[in-house]
């Protein structure tokens, strides 16, 4: 009898440990809490690409293909005045030079001459070389004042899904990779219209950017490797849906006055008090580590382009000292610590290089 009780006790403890490991693993994959994925039909629509957009049978995921005929993409069915936009994404593998996979918000189809935009753009590479990516922000058509930063990743984004997210509120913008905030833009009064203020839609696309994406256009898309497949799943859209608040004939109207009377205060309050709107001390440390190890260009340190940094730039002396006046790294485009980190990873593959350790 005693042996039976002891056996049950051991089994119960083992089950608790297994459950804890599963919960921790889930958090590492999802990265952020309070994310409510939608079905494709709930809030998304086919943008372009004919048969190159393939939805899963459960309508929870979608594949975007690029072949020699066309790329593909989807768009949110509504426009949002501020929001949290998130997806688990897996990128194509092997040779991907010239390819761009983009997850972004924009209103360029509506406000053609003064559009707003928030970008996460993945830039393909030669086989054996890693994907790179950039974030960017435009407000009120300020495309001549790009605010891009470029980075490497601490994992292979073609091997498994990782969550990429954009938070846009009235006061700040945060770009996330899993549970790590990689960039925060705090709104400053001096930014004026350069801070995105008009309703935007969510977009996801894959397309041929051979003219610039890899080594400045030196290497283009090789369609002998096609089709190139990017996968999106567990897509989340949280925000103030302004399309539902407009009369039918005014949907997608390019008159900003049609949107000004829509009250988004409750939605904004929800966004600004949610977990993904607050950077904890551990997450701030993870963001600092990420930027130290993986950021290789920042417009804030590009003094040739901007003799005076744009008003939202926070100049970190230790960070600035690693960059040339072109905004690029001094050390031949490579962080000196990265080589040591690679050696450590080879010794201990289970230890993440960057983690918020929530």
Cite the ranges covered by each PLM segment.
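GH16 jelly-roll
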Residues: 2-358
């Amino acid at each position: 009898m005693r042996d039976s009780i002891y056996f049950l006790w051991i089994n119960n403890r083992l089950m608790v440990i297994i459950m804890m490991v599963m919960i921790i693993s889930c958090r590492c994959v999802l990265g952020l809490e309070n994310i409510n994925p939608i079905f494709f039909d709930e809030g998304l629509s086919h943008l372009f690409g004919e048969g190159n957009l393939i939805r899963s049978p459960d309508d929870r995921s979608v594949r975007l293909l690029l072949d020699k005929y066309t790329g593909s993409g989807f768009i949110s069915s509504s426009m949002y005045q501020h929001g949290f936009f998130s997806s688990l994404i897996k990128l194509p593998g092997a040779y991907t030079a010239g390819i761009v996979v983009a997850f972004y918000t924009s209103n360029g189809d509506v406000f053609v001459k003064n559009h707003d935009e928030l970008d996460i753009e993945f830039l393909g590479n030669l086989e054996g070389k890693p994907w790179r990516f950039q974030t960017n922000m435009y407000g009120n058509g300020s495309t001549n004042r790009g605010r891009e930063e470029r980075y490497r990743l601490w994992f292979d984004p073609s091997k498994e899904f990782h969550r990429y997210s954009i938070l846009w509120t009235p006061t700040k913008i945060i770009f996330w990779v899993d549970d790590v905030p990689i960039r925060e833009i705090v709104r400053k009064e001096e930014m004026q219209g350069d801070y995105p203020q008009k309703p935007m839609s969510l977009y996801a696309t894959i397309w041929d950017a051979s003219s610039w994406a890899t080594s400045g256009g030196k290497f283009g898309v090789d369609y002998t490797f096609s089709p190139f497949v990017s996968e999106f799943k567990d897509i989340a859209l949280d925000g103030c849906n302004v399309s539902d608040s407009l009369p039918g004939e005014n949907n997608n109207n390019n008159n900003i006055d049609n949107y000004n009377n829509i009250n988004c205060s409750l939605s904004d309050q929800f966004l600004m008090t949610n977990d993904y709107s607050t950077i904890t001390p551990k997450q701030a440390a993870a963001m600092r580590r990420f930027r130290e190890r993986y950021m290789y260009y920042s417009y804030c340190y590009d003094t040739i382009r901007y003799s005076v940094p744009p008003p939202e730039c926070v100049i970190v002396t230790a960070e600035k000292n690693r960059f040339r006046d072109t905004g690029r790294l001094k050390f031949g485009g490579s962080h000196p610590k990265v080589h040591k980190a690679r050696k450590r990873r080879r010794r201990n593959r289970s230890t993440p290089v960057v983690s918020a350790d929530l």
